[in-house]
């Protein structure tokens, strides 16, 4: 029996690269879609916020001397490309994915309309939110916290390359241990980088828990959905 009925899955753009240095790795995205399909078949309503860092990162563009707002808009367009790739992979897996974008591009995707998104979720469709919040200076983590709050998700599932939040960087400190659960306040006091500060604060204020887990670990998403000991749960 799934532990959650409606979830917001945050996928980083980098996760779509697989072992490649850039772009979208088809086998990687197909594997992600198969994981998503499995939980959809359990009756879980799934919304996805996707990043664009595999194609372009607004922060990096700004740091290189580009106007930050322009760079962020370019990053939003990168998320649109990823969202369309994810939707296409879902079609091949016989799942109906609908892309809703915070930036209008009506010939390609639907605009973000909250009641429509909720209706599509209730119909068993996977809703993919593209273009972040539609505003520069806000990350796709913040978009995940915002959309998760708007659609009434029970939890934000932050899919990363590590299997949770650790006491220290496990790559640098072999003695680092994974937190099974941790409170928002404790994560702040220990300066643990779960999400960026704006996203983290929004989740805390809305009492929206976050589960950090590895998207690269086989069956991890299903284990999270079933309430098993996978990743790290950040709670109020």
From Swiss-Prot:
Entry keyword RNA-binding: no
SUPFAM superfamilies: Carbamate kinase-like
Compartment list: Cytoplasm
Sample GO molecular function, one term: ATP binding
GO biological process: 'de novo' CTP biosynthetic process; UDP biosynthetic process
Protein residues bound to UMP: 52, 72, 133-140
InterPro entries from the UniProt entry: AceGlu_kinase-like_sf, Asp/Glu/Uridylate_kinase, Uridylate_kinase, Uridylate_kinase_bac
UniProt EC number: 2.7.4.22
Catalytic activity: UMP + ATP = UDP + ADP
CC terms in the record's Gene Ontology section: cytosol
Activity regulation summary: Inhibited by UTP.
This protein's UniProt keywords: ATP-binding, Cytoplasm, Kinase, Nucleotide-binding, Pyrimidine biosynthesis, Transferase
Protein residues bound to ATP: 10-13, 53, 57, 160, 166, 169
Pathway terms, separated by semicolons: Pyrimidine metabolism; CTP biosynthesis via de novo pathway; UDP from UMP (UMPK route): step 1/1
Subunit structure: Homohexamer.
Family: Belongs to the UMP kinase family.
Function description: Catalyzes the reversible phosphorylation of UMP to UDP.
Name of the molecule in the record: Uridylate kinase
Organism: Ralstonia nicotianae (strain ATCC BAA-1114 / GMI1000)
